[in-house]
A protein has these predicted regions:
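Structural alpha/beta surface segment adjacent to cysteine/selenocysteine redox centers
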Residues: 1-56
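C-terminal cap of thioredoxin/glutaredoxin-like
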Residues: 48-138
Length: 138
């Protein structure tokens, strides 16, 4: 199938199921929490979670997997397990709902969605256009 072959071109490892349906709430909670306490570490987190899911076939819906990744990214000195667990048990759910509502308001219905200003571009096929527009200063 063309889509599978096209996606595989971008990956340095074989994929098993490109149509994998996974609950991402735990991973998203980790992202929101990390954005609040250590925004400089967000890129590392996103890369690790993608590798865990697509390369290593780890269940990222498991909160313990996300907790372990946060511990590794932040290190023992920076990771505050009580703060993380409090976030998950209390304000995290509200923060996640707000993020989902904001995405819906912005018209995000597809991943990935990129924004240049307020204009959305959906799908990696848009990357050449986005790059050209950025290079042209548009």
């Amino acid at each position: 199938e063309y889509i599978a072959l096209d996606i595989q071109r971008y990956a340095p490892h074989p994929f098993r199921d490109i149509y994998l349906h996974i609950e991402c709430a735990s991973a998203n909670l980790g992202l929101i929490w990390l954005q609040q306490i250590a925004p400089a570490r967000v890129d590392d987190y996103v890369c690790r979670i993608f590798q865990q899911l697509w390369r290593d076939h780890v269940d990222i819906s498991d909160l313990s997997v996300i907790t372990e990744q946060l511990q590794q990214i932040l290190g023992e000195a920076e990771f505050a397990p009580t703060h993380w667990h409090d976030f998950v048990q209390s304000s995290g759910s509200d923060a996640l709902d707000k993020a989902y509502d904001k995405a819906s308001e912005l018209g995000v219905t597809y991943a990935p969605t990129f924004f240049l200003g307020e204009e959305p571009f959906q799908g990696r096929a848009q990357l050449p256009l986005i790059s050209a527009r950025l290079n042209a200063g548009i």
